[in-house]
């Protein structure tokens, strides 16, 4: 961009994002995320051997973030298998090296962060994919 040239693409993108948020009705977000949390509980994710929930963060907008340690396999390996099923998770030390090193023995953690675009079916697909990935790794 030249000096003084407005960022038209950014302005238009922000406008479309605002329209999308209004279309989704922000007040429905909390209900959506609570439903996803129930789907997480109904799935087998919390019962997968070696996948231990260490942190469940409830955000003000009703969104949940789940952080797991992996015993017997590396979280990056799990992430690679999930990627084969088009599932993205965050792995590593998540900019919290001292605490993650302490809880994971230096291996890192696996974080699941459902979004407004995540469906309950996505949660069950994630559960199935996690089970398949871990069976292959153990």
Residues covered by each model-derived region:
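Pyridoxal 5′-phosphate
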Residues: 1-138
């Amino acid at each position: 961009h030249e000096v003084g040239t407005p960022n038209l693409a950014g302005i238009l993108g922000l406008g479309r994002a605002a329209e999308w948020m209004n279309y989704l009705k922000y007040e429905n977000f909390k209900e959506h995320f609570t439903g996803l949390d129930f789907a997480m509980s109904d799935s087998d994710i919390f019962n997968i051997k070696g996948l231990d929930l260490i942190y469940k963060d409830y955000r003000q907008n009703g969104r949940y973030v789940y952080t797991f340690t992996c015993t017997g396999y590396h979280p990056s390996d799990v992430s690679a298998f999930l990627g084969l099923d088009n599932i993205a998770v965050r792995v590593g030390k998540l900019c919290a090296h001292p605490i993650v090193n302490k809880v994971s023995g230096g291996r890192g953690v696996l974080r699941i962060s459902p979004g407004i675009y995540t469906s309950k079916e996505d949660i069950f697909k994630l559960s199935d994919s996690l089970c398949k990935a871990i069976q292959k790794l153990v």
